[in-house]
Design a protein with these regions (language model features):
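Short, solvent-exposed loop/beta-turn-alpha elements that line the ligand-binding surface or hinge
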Residues: 1-2, 60-65, 81-107, 135-166
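Append "and occasionally in soluble cytosolic enzymes with long acidic Gly/Pro-rich linkers
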Residues: 1-37, 92, 118, 122, ...
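Sec-exported extracytoplasmic/periplasmic mature domains
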Residues: 9-14, 37-44, 61-65, 74, ...
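Hydrophobic anchor at the start of a short beta-strand
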Residues: 18, 46, 130
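Extracytoplasmic/periplasmic, Sec-exported soluble proteins
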Residues: 23-31, 48, 52, 71, ...
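Solvent-exposed loop/turn segments at secondary-structure junctions
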Residues: 24-28, 53-55, 73-77, 121-122, ...
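Periplasmic binding protein-like
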Residues: 30-31, 37-86, 115-116
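C-terminal amphipathic alpha-helical "assembly" element
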Residues: 36-47, 137, 146, 157
Length: 166
């Protein structure tokens, strides 16, 4: 905490409280409590505002009126949202946008993989968002089904490799 307080002072942080706007899911509400506590520990007063989905969509997503929020972005190819400067977190990096156009026009899997690694590095280096945790995915399936992912990285189920065992 001391190093963080020093860094904040060096950056000229004026002590302005932050508004942490949280949608209804438990991961957001509980995560918000933890984040606010950690920020307070280094001297950043954080006001939690629990919103209903309609309020979150109107104020945060459409209105872009927030300081901090927690929301799950786990859709396939979600990285494309970072190439949209009008998206709610308003990230605007022309280098990243050009790279995403290049990725879209590339069909070679190895080249796409390398380009996506570069894109992820840009996002990480620019500190666009903080990645707090991987959502737990709980599921129940018939023992005769094979090919379902365990600990899948997205909320959707990829059924292309699923079949009934004999």
């Amino acid at each position: 905490p001391d190093a963080a307080r020093t860094a904040l002072a060096e950056a000229g942080y004026d002590g302005e409280p932050l508004r942490l706007m949280l949608p209804p899911p438990a991961y957001a509400r509980r995560g918000g409590e933890i984040v606010a506590s950690q920020l307070r520990a280094v001297g950043i007063e954080t006001e939690i505002q629990n919103l209903e989905w309609a309020q979150w969509l109107e104020q945060v997503f459409r209105g872009k009126d927030y300081d901090l929020t927690i929301v799950s972005h786990t859709e396939p190819a979600d990285i494309n949202i970072y190439a949209r400067p009008d998206y709610y977190f308003q990230y605007d990096n022309p280098e990243f946008q050009a790279l995403m156009v290049e990725i879209t026009g590339t069909s070679d899997p190895a080249m796409r993989s390398e380009m996506l690694k570069r894109a992820q590095r840009i996002i990480a280096d620019d500190h666009v968002n903080a990645y707090l945790f991987q959502l737990a995915k709980t599921g129940v399936a018939n023992a005769g089904i094979q090919g379902l992912w365990e600990n899948a990285p997205t909320q959707a189920n990829d059924l292309t490799g699923v079949s009934w065992s004999e």
